[in-house]
Swiss-Prot record:
InterPro entries: UPP_synth-like, UPP_synth-like_CS, UPP_synth-like_sf. The keyword Magnesium applies. Binds 2 magnesium ions per subunit. The lineage of its organism: Archaea, Methanobacteriati, Methanobacteriota, Archaeoglobi, Archaeoglobales. It catalyses: geranylgeranyl diphosphate + 7 isopentenyl diphosphate = tri-trans,hepta-cis-undecaprenyl diphosphate + 7 diphosphate. Its cofactor is Mg(2+). It comes from Archaeoglobus fulgidus (strain ATCC 49558 / DSM 4304 / JCM 9628 / NBRC 100126 / VC-16). The gene is uppS. It holds the Pfam family Prenyltransf. Keywords: Magnesium, Metal-binding, Transferase. Mg(2+) binds at D29. GO terms for biological process: polyprenol biosynthetic process. This is Tritrans,polycis-undecaprenyl-diphosphate synthase (geranylgeranyl-diphosphate specific). Substrate binds at residues 30-34, 46, 74-76, 78, 80, 200, 206-208. Its EC number is 2.5.1.89. The keyword Transferase applies.
């Protein structure tokens, strides 16, 4: 344990000497496999995953990361059992309410945005989302985006449809359509920037339709640990890999 801490501190000092990514996105994979490994129920795996998200938030803000996007629930996840979906939505609501009560949300000026097709979510969760977004909308120092009922291809399709509606109404001319306009019609409404580093836990090496527009030129980092077992060392290694890639880019 002591050698682990020594290595972590050495790695932290090394990472702090370099640039820190502005926007990190994380695919939090492995909650259910973690639960199976530990002989737990799936909802217990999701609970431990939510506690890990709290921890990682603090690590990121302390390192100087300004924006964090967490993939909490995809549109494909609606295929899961009603019991598991209910547990996940209850956990999401609980975590959002915790953020509302947490003094660090206000000390750090954390703005919270939920991105995805929220009309697919339970009404009580939608109301909580609305409340946390309203209460934090003036915060500008740190940004947390939570992707819920999210699909990357659908996000782009919805943005295109929204622009086409404006074209039909005469509000936009076709020749005015550009990348900036499309970004302004994505779920984040232009408020979340391009992703610098995307991390996936759980051993899978794919991005699963997560932020295809925003992460087009990002560095992807895959690690084998299940999300509830993700360590600060793993985060620091991911940032170090990003720093290495950035320093070796061909201009």
């Amino acid at each position: 344990m002591i050698f682990h801490k020594i290595y972590e501190n050495k790695l932290l000092r090394s990472v702090r000497k370099g640039a820190i990514p502005h926007h990190i996105a994380i695919i939090m994979d492995g909650n259910r496999r973690f639960a199976r490994k530990k002989g737990l129920e799936p909802h217990e795996g999701h609970f431990f995953g939510s506690k890990k998200a709290e921890e990682v938030l603090e690590w990121c803000w302390d390192l100087g990361v300004k924006m964090l996007t967490l993939y909490a629930f995809s549109t494909e996840n609606f295929r899961r059992s009603e019991k598991e979906k209910k547990n996940i939505f209850q956990l999401l609501e609980s975590e959002l309410r915790r953020l509302l009560k947490d003094r660090r949300t206000y000390e750090r000026e954390l703005r919270v945005k939920v991105v995805g097709k929220r009309e697919l979510l339970p009404e009580n969760l939608r109301e909580t989302i609305k409340e946390v977004e309203e209460r934090t909308k003036k915060h500008r120092r740190h940004y947390l985006n939570v992707a819920v009922a999210y699909g990357g291809r659908q996000e782009i399709i919805d943005a295109v449809r929204a622009i086409l509606r404006k074209v039909r109404k005469g509000e936009v001319r076709p020749e005015e359509i550009d990348e900036k306009m499309l970004e302004e019609h994505l779920y984040g409404e232009g408020r979340y920037s391009k992703v610098d580093l995307i991390i996936r836990t759980g051993g899978e090496q794919r991005l699963s339709n997560f932020l295809p527009w925003q992460a087009a030129n990002s560095v992807a980092y895959f690690c084998d640990v299940y999300w509830p077992e993700f360590r600060k060392i793993d985060l620091l290694r991911a940032i170090r890999a990003w720093q290495y890639r950035k320093s070796h880019e061909v201009v």
